[in-house]
Design a protein with these regions (language model features):
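A charged, well-structured terminal subsegment
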Residues: 115-143
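Active-site rim loops that border cofactor/substrate pockets in soluble metabolic enzymes
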Residues: 28-55
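Glycine-rich phosphate/diphosphate-binding loop of Rossmann-like nucleotide-binding domains
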Residues: 1-35
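Short, acidic/small-residue loops that bind anionic groups at enzyme active sites
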Residues: 76-102
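Short, ordered loop/turn segments at secondary-structure junctions
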Residues: 9-10, 38, 66-67, 99-105
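Glycine-rich phosphate-binding loop
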Residues: 47-85
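Phosphate/ribose-phosphate-bearing ligand recognition and processing surfaces
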Residues: 71-74, 78, 105-114, 126, ...
Length: 143
């Protein structure tokens, strides 16, 4: 399996915690992966859409990032990101999401690590890739 991790690095400590969990889960699942970074969560869906149209597509995608700040702003960023990620998933992409919504960066970091949100996102992606392969819907040919 070849997986693309798209991470928003707006909060570097949170991103590192999410990435640690995701890479550990992908390594445990014996998946190959590449990692690309974008500035914030709103860019994650666009990056995945671009990658899905590339000449060498991936079997699945993992979206990692965090949203903090005043509730009304953070909730809007989170909702719009999730809406776009859900649309990508509904189009048939195997996509695991690990987007953390919290009041501040410290709380986001704690959530990311204690709940292994990055690992959960990677495991969700892998399970969807496996489902697609079982049903004959693999995104790419396996080597």
């Amino acid at each position: 399996m070849n997986i693309l991790i798209v991470e928003a690095r707006y909060h570097p400590d949170v991103a590192d915690g999410l990435m640690d969990g995701a890479t550990a889960a992908l390594e445990m699942g014996m998946a190959r992966f590449e990692r690309v970074s974008v500035p914030g969560v709103l860019e994650i869906p666009a990056a995945i859409a671009i990658a899905a149209r590339a000449s060498r597509p991936f079997d699945g995608y993992v979206a990692l990032g965090s949203v903090t700040g005043p509730a009304h702003i953070a909730q809007t960023f989170y909702a719009e990101t999730m809406r776009a990620l859900t649309a990508l998933s509904s189009s048939g992409l195997a996509l695991g999401q690990g987007i953390v919504l919290a009041g501040d960066e410290g709380a986001a970091r704690d959530l990311a690590i204690t709940h292994d949100i990055g690992g959960d996102a990677a495991r969700a992606c892998l399970s969807l890739v496996i489902l697609g392969q079982r049903l004959g819907l693999s995104q790419v040919e396996n080597d």
